């Protein structure tokens, strides 16, 4: 069973942000007001491509308890093609990660919570192999 709050988060599953119709800047997660245009800007829902590159990363060896089974794993800031930067796990061999490699979002199991083992899903990034 997926927790209800996760089923209703467009950002969590589909990388949906907003784009300002006035200046064209893209935001993720979604915003209600454009920080550049302020009230002059009108925002619209925008589907991000999910493609980008590793901006920076860290390898996690001492995770929170719900991530113990994944250790070690990579957490990164990914700069998306549209501009926003997103923090997420990268599903890859820790020896094959480096700054600048191209990645894309993929739907993945994130973690299990509590005694009941409630599974949370969302996006992780995976290297794009050419």
From Swiss-Prot:
Pfam families, A to Z: OB_ChsH2_C, zf-ChsH2
Tagged with keyword Metal-binding: yes
Gene Ontology terms for molecular function: metal ion binding
Residues annotated as binding Zn(2+): 20, 23, 34, 37
SUPFAM superfamilies assigned to the protein according to its UniProt record, in alphabetical order: Nucleic acid-binding proteins
Protein's UniProt keywords contain Hydrolase: no
Transmembrane segments: none
UniProt entry keywords in alphabetical sequence: Metal-binding, Zinc
Subunit structure and binding partners: Interacts with acetoacetyl-CoA thiolase and HMG-CoA synthase (HMGCS) that catalyzes the first and second step in the mevalonate pathway, respectively.
Function recorded in the entry: Functions as a scaffold to connect the acetoacetyl-CoA thiolase and HMG-CoA synthase (HMGCS) dimers in the channeling thiolase/HMGCS complex, which allows for efficient coupling of the endergonic thiolase reaction with the exergonic HMGCS reaction.
Family named by the database record: Belongs to the scaffold protein DUF35 family.
Stated name of the protein: DUF35 domain-containing scaffold protein
């Amino acid at each position: 069973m997926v927790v209800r709050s996760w089923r209703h988060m467009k950002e969590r599953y589909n990388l949906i942000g907003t784009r300002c119709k006035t200046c064209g800047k893209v935001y993720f997660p979604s915003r209600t007001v454009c920080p550049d245009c302020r009230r002059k800007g009108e925002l619209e829902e925008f589907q991000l491509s999910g493609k980008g590159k590793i901006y920076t990363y860290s390898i996690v060896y001492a995770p929170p308890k719900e991530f113990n089974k994944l250790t070690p794993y990579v957490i990164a800031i990914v700069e998306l093609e549209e501009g926003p930067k997103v923090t997420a796990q990268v599903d890859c061999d820790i020896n094959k990660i480096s700054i600048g490699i191209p990645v894309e979002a993929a739907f993945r199991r994130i973690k299990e919570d509590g005694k009941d083992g409630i599974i949370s899903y969302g996006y992780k990034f995976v290297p794009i192999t050419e």
